[in-house]
A protein has these predicted regions:
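Short acidic linear motifs
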Residues: 1-176
Length: 176
């Protein structure tokens, strides 16, 4: 039995369909997931690399896999950890958007906000209406992110990347 296709099922449905499979997957990747979750403590992300065509991109995938871990926590009965993790994921995504370091980083941030907020809504739909939210949720949803601010920062960063990339290629052509 394989994993259900991501497009047709919610994260909770996918985890419920194969809880033991996900338990093993999460156990094998626990250290990487813990490191990714620890990044939520940082208030920004800036790439240390110059903007060029050959600039390496961070491995964003572990950040997106935290949604699966939080869904597994919920399915396994650890509601507090699941809710806290989803709210931390929303905040982490918002910070990536606000950093404006690169267009791809902002897009990953938007995906994190969407995935974590969707999971949070799915979990809350199954819980009593008076369910208390963890403290992480206050910061995650404290104030709306001005769309213009996030988009402007991302586009400025993309402009810097494109300009730097072209300059690096011109430098290579002139040197040859």
């Amino acid at each position: 039995q394989g994993l259900p296709p991501q497009q047709r099922y919610s994260e909770l449905e996918r985890v419920r369909a194969a809880p033991q499979l996900y338990a093993g997957l999460l156990e094998r990747n626990a250290a990487q997931l813990d490191r990714a979750a620890a990044l939520a403590e940082w208030d920004h992300f800036h790439s240390p690399f110059p903007p060029r065509f050959d600039t390496p991109l961070p491995a964003y995938q572990p950040l997106t896999r935290l949604v699966t871990r939080d869904a597994w926590y919920f399915v396994s009965g650890d509601v507090e950890a699941a809710l806290a993790g989803s709210c931390a994921g929303v905040l982490q995504g918002r910070r990536l958007i606000q950093s404006g370091d690169s267009l791809i980083g902002s897009m990953i941030g938007a995906a994190l906000v969407n995935g974590n907020a969707t999971l949070l809504a799915d979990m809350l739909a199954e819980l009593p209406g008076d369910q208390r939210l963890p403290v992480q949720c206050g910061a995650a949803f404290a104030s709306p992110l001005p769309a213009a601010e996030g988009v402007c920062q991302a586009m400025l960063a993309e402009g810097r990347y494109s300009t730097g990339a072209m300059r690096s290629q011109v430098g290579v052509a002139v040197a040859a």
